[in-house]
Amino acid sequence: MNQSEKRLFLIQSLLNERPSCQKQIIPTDSERQKILLRGLMNVRRAYPIGTEFLQVQDAYLQGETAAKGITDIADLTPIQPGLYLWQGDITTLRCDAIVNAANSGMTGCYIPNHRCIDNAIHTYAGVELRLACAELMEQQGYPEPTGQAKITPAFNLPCRYVLHTVGPIISGRVTKADKELLASCYRSCLELAAENKLESVAFCCISTGEFHFPNDLAAEIAVATVKEFLKKQTSVKKVIFNVFKDLDKAIYEKLLRAD
């Protein structure tokens, strides 16, 4: 199967799971097919699926990521020893672990084609990631607290693992507790990475965007917490601050070049 044939197979398989979608007309152009496939993956609950689907899905997603272009941490230049700034799609980054800004349900974003990082990571990792997260949450038995972290395989992403953390949600002014919880997100991820003997971790901008933490303050907390952790003797030697917006890139550049 080529990529187009794989995509159609995956779409039809997911439609067949949903009785209400049996008469869904599949678009003919590739971009609309991609939107439909992503949406179907986003709304699919965490239950097992057949081996053939997984084999086709894995080949398809790895092909899509390869087409976007993979960035290897080995090809990046640090701004400071052990500290990197990289602007781009975190789902195309090859390092030991990337960090997902999750919600307390911890099984991904269920809004079709939502532009949050949780949605993107679950989409390009594949349905296995939601299943793995659901197993962890079933074992835990309660929603994920803010400021902690969990680790899963990365499945079809170029990285090896995904670190999932729930950042604080800001509804008014930022409190001292909010700042401490955000710092805890970074610290918990780094501690979990060290426990698993990982060397490189890429952080997204936790709690900014959908969770409304001010970008500049969030970056200050991120940089300070990471620098403090790197003073310890652990396996973690390289940390990437991954940004998507020009605004965040400018904020991090100023912070990292100030020293």
PLM features per residue range, with description:
Residues 1-259:
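Macrodomain-like recognition of ADP-ribose-binding/processing modules
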